[in-house]
């Protein structure tokens, strides 16, 4: 995201924070507004046009959405169109991020939205049929939404369902795995957490997980949430990824390094 877009997003995030508590209805309305804007070339162009005065954009937002969404949603949308966005896609990405953060805020304490997203993403990435169904660019968004409900209703929180439904209905050219990972990162960040994806040859015990999380928290000066991936090809040890950082202590990598030394 460009610097202008990042500054605009930060400004809109402050407005979202000023709302205090946000319910799931408001979050869903924000995501729905983003889909509506993305589905109308004329509306998107008008709201992203830096030559149109903010008060005119406010009028457009109020006219289009005033009868269907609550005032908190309108306040966030007005903040979005007040900003300068580097591209149409980044404006849509900004609304989506704000919506996902709003969903995270709406979750009751202890709701495992981030881990549910991680589990869903892993399930899809290991099932070619699901990946094809969600990744089909010509697929009907409503059919994808129906599939989401069939897979997640009764198995995941309402917040997770709302987020995944958004991702499959407005992918904007992104793969489902990328979408879900990014959403999980946003949810964790909203809770003040950083995600560490830990690949292991066999599952860590609760005690090992706790020690690793504490060690990583000290290193990064932030609370760390672990997501485990079992990968038998690692042979032993583990590989940790936090953002762009990779800590690779797997036996497979050590063996490969030795092979290279003796090649």
Swiss-Prot record:
Q: Do the record's keywords include Membrane?
A: yes
Q: Which organism is it from?
A: Clavibacter sepedonicus (Clavibacter michiganensis subsp. sepedonicus)
| Descriptive protein name | ATP synthase subunit delta
Tell me which stretches of the chain form a coiled coil.
none
What's this protein's function? Answer: F(1)F(0) ATP synthase produces ATP from ADP in the presence of a proton or sodium gradient. F-type ATPases consist of two structural domains, F(1) containing the extramembraneous catalytic core and F(0) containing the membrane proton channel, linked together by a central stalk and a peripheral stalk. During catalysis, ATP synthesis in the catalytic domain of F(1) is coupled via a rotary mechanism of the central stalk subunits to proton translocation.
Q: Which PANTHER family match?
A: ATP SYNTHASE DELTA CHAIN
Write out the entry's keywords from A to Z.
ATP synthesis, Cell membrane, CF(1), Hydrogen ion transport, Ion transport, Membrane, Transport
Disulfide bridge map: none
Q: Which InterPro entries match?
A: ATPase_OSCP/d_CS, ATPase_OSCP/dsu
Family note: Belongs to the ATPase delta chain family.
């Amino acid at each position: 995201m460009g610097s202008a877009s990042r500054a605009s997003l930060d400004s809109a995030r402050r407005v979202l924070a000023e709302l205090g508590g946000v319910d799931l209805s408001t979050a869903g309305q924000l995501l729905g507004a983003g889909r509506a804007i993305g589905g109308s070339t004329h509306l998107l162009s008008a709201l992203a046009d830096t030559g149109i005065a903010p008060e005119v954009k406010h009028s457009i937002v109020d006219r289009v959405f005033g009868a269907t969404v609550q005032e908190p949603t309108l306040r966030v949308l007005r903040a979005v169109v007040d900003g300068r966005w580097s591209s149409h896609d980044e404006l849509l990405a900004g609304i989506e991020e704000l919506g996902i953060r709003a969903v995270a805020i709406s979750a009751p304490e202890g709701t495992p939205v981030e881990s549910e997203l991680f589990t869903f993403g892993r399930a899809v990435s290991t099932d070619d049929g699901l990946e094809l169904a969600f990744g089909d660019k010509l697929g009907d968004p409503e059919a994808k939404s129906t599939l989401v409900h069939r897979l997640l209703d009764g198995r995941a929180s309402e917040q997770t369902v709302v987020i995944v439904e958004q991702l499959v209905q407005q992918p904007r050219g992104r793969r489902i795995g990328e979408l879900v990972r990014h959403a999980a990162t946003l949810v964790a960040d909203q809770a003040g957490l950083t995600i560490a994806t830990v690949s292991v040859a066999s599952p860590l015990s609760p005690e090992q997980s706790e020690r690793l999380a504490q060690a990583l928290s000290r290193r990064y000066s932030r609370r760390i949430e672990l997501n485990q991936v079992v990968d038998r090809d690692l042979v032993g040890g583990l590989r940790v990824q936090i953002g762009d950082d990779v800590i690779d202590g797997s036996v497979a990598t050590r063996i490969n390094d030795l092979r290279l030394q003796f090649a």
